[in-house]
């Protein structure tokens, strides 16, 4: 069976890998799988980001949904978490987002949400993939009144914006610099922060279909850092292309990453008795300084594999309400079921406003250790078995002994490529270089492809 779904839906170069033909099939088969047990006409929300390929894929996807009798509500440009929110609150059968998140404009993606607002379970993805791989399409082909209908639904954006504002507090007297990545947040972030009475300055707000994430947004915060310093803003907020992640900038122009954002919000919730099980869910990539700050604060942590879907799975299974990743995916389950950059930004500003502390003061409680990551090309068959190689296991153990608890080593296989990732954290850059380079040399000698 072909593997179409990755960790965040189906992705590829638009019109080359992710074609209109595939989008049509995903609409048809995905719509069928997600609505086959509905007793009334299914209702599905569809949104996209600002990529030039978005309307092409949107049209094809919607045609597929209509072909199996689904009532489609077209949201236009909207943040990914907005789809998740509307699916839950408007009691839809499913939602679909057309976006490749932080990827460049030539890529695009299609991801589905079930009627609970969560991304699809593995068995649902497998069912869709089985239909994609079937020798022929045997699904029903309704006609006349059995066909689906299309409803333009611009009010979905207004409802999502109103929801975001209700989670915040009055930001009068605060200046906020926004970078909307020329993406989905460009239609909402300005209005939301104005409604919260903040003074704002905005960049990355002029999408042309080709400039999404291009030198702007959460993966390129340099322009925002300059804007914060130029305007004297209290904080800067950078979203990615579909606004499901956030990277912040403090008033001095320094980056505040997902680890620090989670700590700031988590500490605030913990002190109010609102942090479920007094626990934050994070991944193996979170910085050692983040872990030490949690320990000092008496906050527990649950650690998952890399990927926001694994964070969400742990949150759902154990009843936690805050989790996320260093990259800026932060899930606040009290409000939404997926990472939401604008929601997280509002909560961060709320903590600043209610504590009266600057972002640099709040972030200073987490001392970020220098971190280095090296990717080493290995045979696919060996990447999962690297730790079985005695020389590799021995050098890792030796380096960990030298660290004496004041550092961290993580060696893990890539989920999608024939790579072994070697990461280390330590108090100084020189120590990090030493640990990573020493381990990487042994890995290359033992199982590297270049040998």
From Swiss-Prot:
One of its GO terms (molecular function) is phosphomannomutase activity. The keyword Isomerase applies. Binds 1 Mg(2+) ion per subunit. One of its GO terms (cellular component) is cytosol. One of its GO terms (biological process) is peptidoglycan biosynthetic process. Keywords: Isomerase, Magnesium, Metal-binding, Phosphoprotein. Activated by phosphorylation. Pfam families: PGM_PMM_I (PF02878), PGM_PMM_II (PF02879), PGM_PMM_III (PF02880), PGM_PMM_IV (PF00408). Its cofactor is Mg(2+). It comes from the Bacteria. The active site is at 101 (phosphoserine intermediate). Mg(2+) binds at residues 101, 240, 242, 244. It catalyses: alpha-D-glucosamine 1-phosphate = D-glucosamine 6-phosphate. Gene3D superfamilies: Alpha-D-Glucose-1,6-Bisphosphate, subunit A, domain 3 (3.40.120.10), Alpha-D-phosphohexomutase, C-terminal domain (3.30.310.50). It is an enzyme of class 5 (isomerase). Its EC number is 5.4.2.10. The modification Phosphoserine is found at residue 101. HAMAP family: GlmM_B (MF_01554_B). Belongs to the phosphohexose mutase family. This is Phosphoglucosamine mutase.
């Amino acid at each position: 069976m072909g593997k179409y779904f990755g960790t965040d839906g189906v992705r590829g170069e638009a019109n080359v890998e992710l074609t209109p033909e595939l989008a049509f099939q995903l609409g048809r088969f995905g719509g069928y799988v997600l609505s086959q047990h509905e007793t009334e006409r299914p209702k599905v929300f569809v949104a996209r980001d600002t990529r030039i390929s978005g309307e092409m894929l949107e049209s094809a996807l919607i045609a597929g949904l209509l072909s199996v009798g689904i009532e489609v509500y077209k949201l236009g440009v909207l943040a990914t978490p907005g789809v998740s929110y509307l699916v839950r609150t408007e009691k839809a059968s499913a939602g679909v987002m057309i976006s490749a998140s932080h990827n460049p404009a030539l890529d695009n993606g299609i991801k589905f949400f079930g009627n609970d607002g969560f991304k699809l379970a593995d068995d649902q993805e497998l069912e869709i993939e089985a239909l994609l791989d079937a020798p022929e399409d045997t699904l029903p082909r309704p006609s006349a009144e059995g066909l689906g209908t299309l409803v333009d639904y611009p009010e979905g954006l207004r409802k999502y914006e109103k929801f975001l504002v209700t989670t915040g507090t009055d930001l009068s007297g605060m200046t906020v610099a926004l970078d909307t990545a020329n993406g989905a947040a460009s239609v909402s972030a300005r209005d939301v922060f104005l409604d919260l009475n903040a003074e704002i300055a905005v960049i990355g707000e002029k999408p042309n279909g080709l400039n999404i994430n291009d030198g702007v947004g959460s993966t390129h915060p340099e322009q925002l850092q300059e804007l914060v310093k130029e305007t004297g803003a209290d904080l800067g907020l950078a979203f990615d292309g579909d606004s499901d992640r956030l990277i912040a900038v403090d008033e001095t122009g320094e980056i505040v990453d997902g680890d620090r954002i989670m700590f700031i919000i988590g500490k605030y919730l913990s002190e109010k008795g609102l942090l479920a099980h007094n626990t934050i869910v994070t991944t193996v990539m979170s910085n050692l300084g983040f872990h030490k700050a949690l320990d000092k604060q008496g906050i527990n942590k649950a650690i998952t594999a890399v990927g926001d879907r694994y964070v969400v799975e742990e949150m759902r299974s154990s009843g936690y309400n805050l989790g996320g990743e260093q990259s800026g995916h932060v899930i606040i389950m009290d409000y939404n079921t997926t990472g939401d950059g604008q929601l997280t930004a509002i909560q961060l500003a709320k903590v600043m406003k209610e504590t009266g502390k600057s972002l640099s003061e709040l972030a200073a409680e987490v001392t970020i250790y220098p971190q280095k990551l090296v990717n080493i090309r290995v045979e696919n068959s060996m990447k999962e078995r690297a730790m079985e190689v005695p020389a590799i296991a021995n050098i890792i153990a030796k380096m960990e002994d030298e660290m004496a608890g004041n550092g961290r080593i993580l060696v893990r296989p890539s989920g999608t490529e024939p790579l072994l990732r070697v990461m280390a954290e330590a108090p100084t850059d020189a120590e990090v270089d030493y640990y990573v380079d020493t381990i990487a040399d042994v890995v290359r000698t033992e199982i590297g492809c270049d040998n």
